[in-house]
Amino acid sequence: MNIIEQFEKEQIEKLLEQRGVPQFSPGDTLRVHVKVIEGNRQRVQVYEGVCIARRNAALNSSFTVRKISFGEGVERIFPLYAPTIDRIEVVRRGKVRRAKLYYLRGRQGRSARIIEDTTATQQALAVEREISQERKASGKDQASKPEVRPQGKKPAPKPKAKK
C-alpha cells in the first residue's frame, strides 16, 4: 500500500466517524440530504430517488440517484464522501440482479418499478437495532446515525356497503 492509498484510507475512516454512511446498493431507494449554500444562508435539500449505479473508488466513490420530477427523469451523481452531503437514508431495499440500472432510463411507469427486497430490509433493521443497543450500552448514542425505515404496505380500503 503506497502513501496515497494509506492517506485516503485514513481520511475515509475519519469521515465515517463523523458521518456514518449506510450500506446501500443499486436498486435501493435513497433519501440524500444535501447542504445547499445560497448567498450567506445554508439549508438542507432532500433528494429522493432510486440508486441506479455505485462507483467504489476509495475516496473518489460516488453513486447515481434517479428520480422522476414532473414527468422528466432527473439523475444526479453524488460523491460519497463529499462534505455537502449531510446524511444518506435508505428508504427501501430493491431486489435487482444488475450492478448498473441504466435500463431504467428507457422505461416509464410500472415497468420502471423495482421489487422491494423485504428480507434485506428486515436484516438491515435487525443490524440497526443491534448497533443502537451497543451504542446505548457504551453511552455513545448519536443523533446523526443512518436511518433505515421499511416502507410498509397500507391495507386496502374496505368496500362501502350499498344501502
From Swiss-Prot:
An annotated GO BP: translation
Transmembrane segments: none
SUPFAM superfamilies referenced in this protein's UniProt entry, alphabetically: Translation proteins SH3-like domain
Sequence ranges of Basic and acidic residues compositional bias: 131-150
Segments for region (Disordered): 131-163
GO MF, any single term: structural constituent of ribosome
Entry keyword Ribonucleoprotein: yes
A Pfam family per the record: Ribosomal_L19
Basic residues composition-biased segments: 151-163
GO cellular component, one term: cytosolic large ribosomal subunit
Gene3D superfamilies, sorted: 2.30.30.790
Keywords, sorted A to Z: Ribonucleoprotein, Ribosomal protein
The keyword Ribonucleoprotein is annotated on this UniProt entry: yes
Physiological role: This protein is located at the 30S-50S ribosomal subunit interface and may play a role in the structure and function of the aminoacyl-tRNA binding site.
HAMAP family: Ribosomal_bL19
Family classification: Belongs to the bacterial ribosomal protein bL19 family.
Matches recorded under PANTHER family: LARGE RIBOSOMAL SUBUNIT PROTEIN BL19M (PTHR15680:SF9), RIBOSOMAL PROTEIN L19 (PTHR15680)
Name the UniProt record assigns to this protein: Large ribosomal subunit protein bL19
Gene: rplS
